[in-house]
Amino acid sequence: MLEGCILAGSRQIESTTNNSVPGAPNRISFAKLREPLEVPGLLDVQTESFEWLIGAEDWFQRAADRGDVDPKGGLQEVLEELSPIEDFSGSMSLSFSDPRFDEVKAPVDECKDKDMTYAAPLFVTAEFINNNTGEIKSQTVFMGDFPMMTEKGTFIINGTERVVVSQLVRSPGVYFDESIDKSTEKTLHSVKVIPGRGAWLEFDVDKRDTVGVRIDRKRRQPVTVLLKALGWTNEQIVERFGFSEIMMSTLEKDNTAGTDEALLDIYRKLRPGEPPTKESAQTLLENLFFKEKRYDLARVGRYKVNKKLGLNVGQPITSSTLTEEDVVATIEYLVRLHQGDQTMTAPGGSEVPVEVDDIDHFGNRRLRTVGELIQNQIRVGLSRMERVVRERMTTQDVEAITPQTLINIRPVVAAIKEFFGTSQLSQFMDQNNPLSGLTHKRRLSALGPGGLSRERAGLEVRDVHSSHYGRMCPIETPEGPNIGLIGSLSVYARVNPFGFIETPYRKVTDGVVTDQIDYLTADEEDRHVVAQANSPLDGDGHFEEERVLVRRKGGEVEFVSAAEVDYMDVSPRQMVSVATAMIPFLEHDDANRALMGANMQRQAVPLVRSEAPLVGTGMELRAAIDAGDVVVTEKAGVVEEVSADYITVMADDGTRHTYRMRKFARSNHGTCANQRPIVDAGQRVESGQVLADGPCTENGEMALGKNLLVAIMPWEGHNYEDAIILSNRLVEEDVLTSIHIEEHEIDARDTKLGAEEITRDIPNVSDEVLADLDERGIIRIGAEVRDGDILVGKVTPKGETELTPEERLLRAIFGEKAREVRDTSLKVPHGESGKVIGIRVFSREDDDELPAGVNELVRVYVAQKRKISDGDKLAGRHGNKGVIGKILPVEDMPFLPDGTPVDIILNTHGVPRRMNIGQILETHLGWVAKAGWNIDVAAGTPEWAAKLPEQMLSAPADSIVATPVFDGAQEGELQGLLGSTLPNRDGETMVNADGKATLFDGRSGEPFPYPVTVGYMYILKLHHLVDDKIHARSTGPYSMITQQPLGGKAQFGGQRFGEMECWAMQAYGAAYTLQELLTIKSDDTVGRVKVYEAIVKGENIPEPGIPESFKVLLKELQSLCLNVEVLSSDGAAIEMRDGDDEDLERAAANLGINLSRNESASVEDLA
């Protein structure tokens, strides 16, 4: 949040990217522009805000370097606000200071393992002063365990990794608005003074041209009443506002005479029904706006009010309440706005522009980052504690009081716990892949407490605004009800101390672009003229063209002379977020499709073997490193030892560092997080170099998918409507195979009938089923399991039942009590299978922390290898998504002239109307990168290659290239490179200069009639896997009321034969089929059992009974006081019996059917 500005050296344009990170792969870059600023730390929005909250040393260091920062930590600030707490008589006080932390209780991995919270004990110094005797008692007080942020910007709460999302809210301040009156068509003006905490103050000019005021959303009254209540006389009002007719007419209509009457009038409006007195009215008004305990504009509100009204400009902010001058200046501004004045002279003599505010402008919306959100929660907890302290001060003996006896920390601890556990802004971290986690931490949400609700939010607040430029990405936002309410921070953006988002610009002085970087808020940017990053410059930094394309306030674009330009963008990718900046040729994609592309990259699952894209954007390395899933060297040195589990580095200063790998760990979303070394023993490594790849990374670069040979053509209609045809090679060679890990948990508790027991001795289970269980009853690691298999054996005591005479005889003879237990073992859920890769056992005997009543807890991890299959969803990076419709044998796939079969066939119809042409350009450049190129310069450098550096005139096969957004490969360069690709080993060029090739049909060997676009596209396998969605049911749980099967895979439900399906049956006249479907196959409970019995006994199927839903319908009609009866054909009333049929009970018992099985808790209960 408070990061200082970094200046990079003025290096020449590099033909390779990733140069700032040692040991990084060499990606050939098509960028034409030099970027004077490195991409800042992508997690700074989280980490710096939390450092401010706890008052970390690093934060103080940064605060000292900048003048606009109040050098006080967030905890210190909130303790100073609270102190001193005085009793009602003012004879004693308690104050707090010096918050500090002890060491964290357990490391991150242990907290995840044992369901603990990653936290450190918080201590403060509490000082009790007896004002009567002057006695001071000081103590260090424990204030509870405070959740700490990990290095990755996350929190571990009860063993799960969570992220606190930054919240976009309307800033406290003063806002002027304009509206048209529907009846008179007059332009009306109003103003709201919005505090951080406290009552709203609203002024408005109505259609009768009087100025009114609303205090705390109560009834409107003339504004002069408020001025008189503040001590103003009629003469003073005339002297200050004599220039305004509407103020004079308001004064004439005001019936109050003097301050006392005005105060009483306000009191009557605010407290109707209570007897008004001058003192109580005076106290009420002061408490509402002028007492810090009740009213808080916040530092940012004070700053905004001063800026808008031109008060105390340039002076340090001290007070955070309203002043009389604020109220008067606000009224004058409103009156002048209504008069149509352009400027107003502020009390300090400065000229202030008079204009209406745009509430959606980023100058009026600020960010509550994680530190401020937690600080607000602590403030709530401390204010609850304050009440307890005051009560204890009055009840306890003064001599015996110490700070410890007064303080109850429970409200503070509860407030923090409540925030992390239940707040809308504390979210379960998206760990699908490293990019999804990184984007989650950089997310900006307008929802949450104090924000908008998705039902109330209109189109204006959701829309892209010109002030978003360089601050919030205009592309990346969810589809659906949250569109525009949730955004993503732009690549270079940072947050200033007031919570406004700033973006960097290069300073332009007298038409010369310098390397000085200034961070501007949206308000400041409106005052300047800004040129775009790709404006051509000469070697000295002068603009090459006399007229430069710039943007002014409100996003207006025009050409101006170079001397008028104030600033220039630092980078073409300045306006987009990290995920959007990873889409090559973004500039050729329609924004709607780019939105889908950015979102779908976050849904890519980590594959068994990651592969970095042939065509990247240069953002892949920074994204992967900052996401924190790769292992990075802390100090330069030499690799001493490498194994699959750890890497040891001997640093140059003689210290030894061991880096542990995460091996096949389960992420929050069930994907596999595995790290593997990419360095060798004896290798020299520099500080910041990547030692080991994580999920979805290759050589330290983000690698979300695979480079596949794609042909864009229709194929027998099998790829109609975005369906995709795949080669069987991708299945056989595990190209798109991913590993998914599920966690299954069971606990043994104390019950009323005795303790549950985890055991191998399970009643009525064959030895075959128990074969893979160890002596404790827990499955062995490495066992292959499928649905229904026992993972952990558990028995639960059953209540004593009435014994049969035979059992009583056996007990009398043998004297032993039959074990009354039932099998409640943990079984593999329906539709799942895999290999057991890990087991964790927690036991009270081993002193593990377990919930009350739990004696033992067992977790089993089952890994499943999922090959790509029909029904899985694939996508490119341009919003081009589809479901696999057919997997063809390799020999049936279309092939190139040299016999190379393509991997994937996409339909041509997926491109034109979607306007995502970037996928075609990526396909062409992918082929160029895979084949390599050599530009013929014998007759001089071709015109299209004039801007390419010398190193880029040739490249070997399997090169990796970068085409940064808005500064990438040009169309002419792409065409030229396609004509310069290297031939294959037979000396033939497979793809023509237009990017098309002659393809042959794999089945007939005949060439297709037209050339086909062929190249390499980066394809992602998304988390929407068919294995998670496919589902079938024979019998299962029923709804308690209607007795119909439940719906959905999670409930093990069935397919609903709905209204339209019934119509279809009626149309065909299939009466008996329809009757069967509506009764015995659905909710005729008696009929169901009788049919089952008939099938078992081989008898004819009996007549259906009455469906349960018909009985429910009758009851509902009767509940509406309608007397509904069912009559037979002869007019006799038919009695509806409620399933107490003895025959039914008997038949069910004989067949072993449990008729009480309703809304089963789990699939295992169905057995």
From Swiss-Prot:
E.C. no: 2.7.7.6
One Pfam family cited in the UniProt record for this chain: RNA_pol_Rpb2_1
Keyword entries, A-Z: DNA-directed RNA polymerase, Nucleotidyltransferase, Transcription, Transferase
GO terms assigned for molecular function: DNA binding; DNA-directed RNA polymerase activity; ribonucleoside binding
Catalytic activity: RNA(n) + a ribonucleoside 5'-triphosphate = RNA(n+1) + diphosphate
Highest taxon listed in the record's lineage: Bacteria
Assembly, per entry: The RNAP catalytic core consists of 2 alpha, 1 beta, 1 beta' and 1 omega subunit. When a sigma factor is associated with the core the holoenzyme is formed, which can initiate transcription.
UniProt-listed NCBIfam families: PRK00405.1 (NF001616), rpoB (TIGR02013)
Function noted in UniProt: DNA-dependent RNA polymerase catalyzes the transcription of DNA into RNA using the four ribonucleoside triphosphates as substrates.
Full protein name: DNA-directed RNA polymerase subunit beta
